[in-house]
Curated annotation (Swiss-Prot):
Gene Ontology cellular component annotations, sorted alphabetically: cytosol
Catalytic reaction list: tRNA(Leu) + L-leucine + ATP = L-leucyl-tRNA(Leu) + AMP + diphosphate
Entry protein name: Leucine--tRNA ligase
This protein's encoding gene: leuS
Organism of provenance: Borreliella burgdorferi (strain ZS7) (Borrelia burgdorferi)
Keywords associated with the record: Aminoacyl-tRNA synthetase, ATP-binding, Cytoplasm, Ligase, Nucleotide-binding, Protein biosynthesis
CDD domains cross-referenced by the UniProt entry: Anticodon_Ia_Leu_BEm, LeuRS_core
One protein family per Pfam: tRNA-synt_1_2
Matches recorded under Gene3D superfamilies: HUPs (3.40.50.620), Isoleucyl-tRNA Synthetase, Domain 1 (1.10.730.10)
Keyword Metal-binding in record: no
Alphabetical list of InterPro entries matching this protein: aa-tRNA-synth_I_CS, aa-tRNA-synth_Ia, Leu-tRNA-ligase, Leu_tRNA-synth_edit, M/V/L/I-tRNA-synth_anticd-bd, Methionyl/Leucyl_tRNA_Synth, Rossmann-like_a/b/a_fold, tRNAsynth_Ia_anticodon-bd
GO terms of molecular function: aminoacyl-tRNA deacylase activity; ATP binding; leucine-tRNA ligase activity
Superkingdom to which the source organism belongs: Bacteria
Motif stretch ('KMSKS' region): 617-621
This protein's record includes keyword Ligase: yes
Length: 840
């Protein structure tokens, strides 16, 4: 029996695909739009660690689907590239002392080798790298279009600064932990700083970003997260006059029906009015409080679980309708960047206001109740009800009626107006780091921004020896005086660079025309392929990459450069592949190499105490990272591909277990060993024809729906059926090889060649069609006899008729061999039971 030499087979076919450019694709206008398919993976950033087994999960899914569609006559575009600018590459360079240009190239080569070893059907001629000049020239060009459209501006603003990373981070890059706000990458401490920043007006597109979600085939959870991040609210903006001041406080509220329950106003610690309106004898306390609160994260300040804090300014405002005096407080739970930076305190009908009022013993005045009568409140009443404690014309009404009347009164008396507000804030676009796209802007002596001419692009990132962050909030580029100062013009360059998200905002468009030096992509090519039909990647990018790229795409659409309103038609988030780790009694996880297994139990080598096996995220510190190179070396790429898809539904998280891949490896060996049987061109038995059409149907339907685990299961069942036969029937084996090929392309190509077909299977075959009528559904065992003696037993559909039963019996190989030179006297058929052939 010849051994399944997967290493040799996989190397052979990977070289064949490379040398023959099997997966290279060009635009062909004769192919109708409905037969074109653009499949995309979220491209990787090339870290020094390389891939672990979790990374290829999404790539394998798109590869299977792409190959399946290719065999179904689709014109498939499936490109790959590298998100090679940004913090991960730069941090690695700083840690190792290797220049990011060099380390990035080395890491990309490592990634490419690992990706190619898995046999993915990428068109490598379309490879892109966001750090290369021919790519970031167009990132800079798009930035200039944003600037010219008034969507990029400079602003001195409070920003999150990470001393460890040496850069400003966007709100979306901050996570809340029990130890306070941290950077999303690295979980480093952050602080608030006032710095000059480039900001993009994503808020101008808030409504469209919200509305167009309805057109997308995306997971509802992702759409809901984007809706919440954009945070649309419809309400009223109300003006409050301040006692002794000409300034006014504007408040946005979605509950104008509670206006008569206002007992205080709260303004954000960032509000510029604070110094102006605070009474002298309150100033010291107020300014101390402001300084303390500005360093907290937005999430920390607004969380319902967090203790509400505040300080009285000593000043008062006037109620816009009743003219009553209302105390003005500064409070941590109000954000200067959301709405107007001020809220009306209605403690009877808002939980945060209720907590605040209780803490500082402020008046709580209910103006809505369920019964229309005063009731004792143990918590804020936030439901609908009847108005109470209000001026006569607003009293004893449904609160919905009060809302309408208040809006009309405020509008008529010019004390307020209807308004839509969003939680979404403009995108902080500057980074004080070296390894990123230089921003193509000059400043004159007065500080006016002057965009570079388009024919001066790319503005190249200068090579420097010291690329470490300055620690002062300035970019490392600011140290290169001869680059910063444009002497012949008397201008200075912008020294901040773009964030990592810039290059990934539009990469899917560059794949369409990666070598074009005259434009970011030819318009006809964009119209040919866009939008992306299937996009697979991690859910962690919901409010970062996915929101940013939608924004840039809409700008390009408005400018007439792209033909679709949205870039990604269908999105799938693959589940996380976790790993096993080990936990001590106190809950502490210990590294895997510190654990020993005895009698199916696990023990800590250090103290010999039993530990519990748990599921945890793969991490270097826990030593539970599985390297795909090791798996491929031991079991092969096809085994790894199939195992990753067989572990469970694509969108579910699941733990990696190397023991589980052994079963998949056996499955592929079973298929390989079919070569040992005679390859017969005879007509196969009806039962195996039925099994073939059943498996084609199942694999077709499940692959179409991305239900890869159940498709693989069906193929495993089929192979066990096929192994029962003495011969390997060509008419069965050939279509099976084709349906196997998206899942195990290397083995399929080898078997395709073995049965005498021309390679590549992916260019010289078509996906087989199933015939429903050939599938035996309600099975009955039929006994085949000659002169009353049993010769065979077969399974047939219950509804098989007498004529067909006779024909099937006469075609049976065991019956045929016993009929040679014999005369048939008669054929007796008992439906759903037997066929008896009487001979002499």
């Amino acid at each position: 029996m010849s051994k399944y030499e997967f290493i040799k087979i996989e190397k052979k076919w990977q070289e064949f695909w490379d040398n023959n450019k099997t997966y290279k694709v060009e635009e062909d206008p004769s192919i109708p739009k409905e037969k074109r398919l653009y499949i995309l993976d979220m491209f990787p950033y090339p870290s020094a660690n390389g891939l672990h087994v979790g990374h290829p999960e999404g790539y394998t899914a798109t590869d299977i689907f792409g190959r399946y569609k290719l065999l179904n006559g689709f014109h498939v575009l499936h490109p790959i590239g590298f998100d090679s600018f940004g913090l991960p590459a730069e941090n690695y360079a700083i840690q190792t002392g290797t220049h990011p240009q060099k380390s990035t190239e080395e890491n990309i080569n490592k990634f490419k080798k690992q990706i190619k070893a898995l046999g993915f059907a990428y068109d490598w001629d379309r490879e892109i790298r966001t750090h290369e000049e021919n790519y970031y020239k167009w990132t800079q060009w798009i930035f200039l279009q944003l600037y010219k459209k008034g969507l990029a501006y400079v602003k001195e603003m409070p920003v999150w600064y990470c001393p460890e990373l040496g850069t400003v981070l966007a709100n979306e890059e901050i996570i809340q932990t029990s130890d306070g706000p941290k950077s999303e990458r690295g979980s480093y401490s952050v602080e608030k700083k006032y710095l000059r920043q480039w900001v993009l007006k994503i808020t101008k597109y808030a409504e469209r970003l919200l509305d167009d979600l309805e057109e997308l085939e995306w997971p509802e959870s992702v759409k809901e997260m984007q809706r919440n991040w954009i945070g649309k609210s419809t309400g009223v903006e109300i003006e409050f006059e301040i006692e002794g001041h000409s300034d006014k406080i504007k408040v946005f509220t979605t509950r104008p029906d509670t206006i008569f329950g206002i007992t205080y106003l709260v303004i954000a610690p960032e509000n510029k009015l604070i110094e102006k309106i605070t009474k002298n004898n309150f100033k010291q306390n107020v300014l101390k409080y402001v300084k303390h609160e500005e360093l907290k994260s937005d999430l920390n300040r607004t969380s319902l679980e967090k203790d509400k804090s505040g300080v009285f300014t000593g000043s008062y405002a006037f109620h816009p309708i009743t003219n009553e005096k209302i105390p003005i407080w500064v409070g941590s739970y109000v954000l200067g960047t959301y709405g107007t930076g001020a809220v009306m305190g209605v403690p009877a009908h808002d939980e945060r206001d209720f907590q605040f009022a209780k803490k500082y013993q402020l008046k709580i005045l209910p103006v809505i109740s369920k019964s229309g009568k005063n009731e004792i409140l143990e918590k804020a009443f936030v439901d609908d009800g009847i108005s109470i404690n209000s001026p006569n014309e607003f009293n004893n009404l449904k609160n919905s009626e009060v809302k309408d009347k208040v809006i009309k009164w405020l509008t008529k008396n010019k004390k307020g107006k209807e308004k839509v507000a969003y939680k979404l804030r403009d995108w902080i676009f500057s980074r004080q780091r070296y390894w990123g796209e230089p921003i193509p802007i000059l400043f004159d002596k007065l500080g006016n921004a002057i965009p570079l001419e388009e024919n001066d692009l790319p503005l190249k990132l200068p090579e420097i020896a010291n690329y470490k962050p300055s620690g002062t909030g300035e970019s490392p580029l600011s140290r290169i005086k001869d680059w910063v100062n444009v002497k012949d013009m008397g201008f200075t360059r912008e020294t901040n660079t773009m964030p990592q998200w810039a290059g990934s905002c539009w990469y899917y468009l560059r794949y369409l025309d990666p070598k074009n030096s005259k434009e970011f992509a030819n318009k006809k090519k964009i119209e040919y392929w866009m939008p992306v039909d299937l996009y697979i990647g991690g859910a962690e990018h919901t409010v970062l990459h996915l929101l940013y790229s939608r924004f840039w795409h809409k700008v390009l659409y408005d400018l007439g450069y792209v033909n679709t309103k949205e870039p990604f038609k269908k999105l799938i988030n693959q589940g996380i592949i976790t790993s096993f780790s080990y936990q001590k009694e106190n809950g502490v996880l210990i590294p895997n190499d510190q654990v020993i297994e005895k009698d199916n139990k696990f023990f800590d080598k250090k103290d010999n105490k039993e530990v519990t096996q748990v599921i945890a995220k793969m991490s270097k510190s826990l030593k539970n990272v599985i390297n795909p190179d090791d798996i491929i070396k031991e079991f092969g790429a096809d085994s790894m591909r199939i195992y990753e898809m067989f572990m469970g539904p694509l969108t579910d998280s699941k733990p990696w277990n190397t023991k589980g891949i052994i079963g998949v490896f056996r499955f592929l060996n079973k298929i390989w060993n079919l070569r040992e049987k005679e390859l017969s061109k005879e007509n196969p038995p009806r039962e195996i024809i039925s099994e073939l059409h059943k498996v084609i149907k199942k694999v077709t339907e499940d692959t179409e729906k991305l239900n890869f685990n159940t498709a693989i299961s069906a193929m495993m069942i089929f192979i066990n059926e096929l192994l029962k036969y003495e011969k390997n029937y060509l008419n069965i084996f050939k279509p099976f090889i084709i349906i196997l090929s998206p899942y195990a392309p290397h083995l399929a190509e080898e078997l395709w060649e073995y049965i005498g077909e021309l390679p590549s299977l992916f260019k010289n075959s078509k996906w087989p069609k199933f015939d429903e009528s050939l599938i035996i559904k309600d099975k009955k065992e039929i006994v085949l006899q000659i002169n009353g003696k049993i010769k065979d037993k077969i399974l047939l559909n219950k509804e098989t008729g007498e004529k067909e039963l006779k024909e099937i019996a006469m075609e049976n190989s065991k019956i045929k061999s016993n009929l040679l030179n014999k005369k048939i006297v008669k054929i007796i058929v008992i439906k759903n039971k037997l066929v008896n052939i009487v001979i002499k």
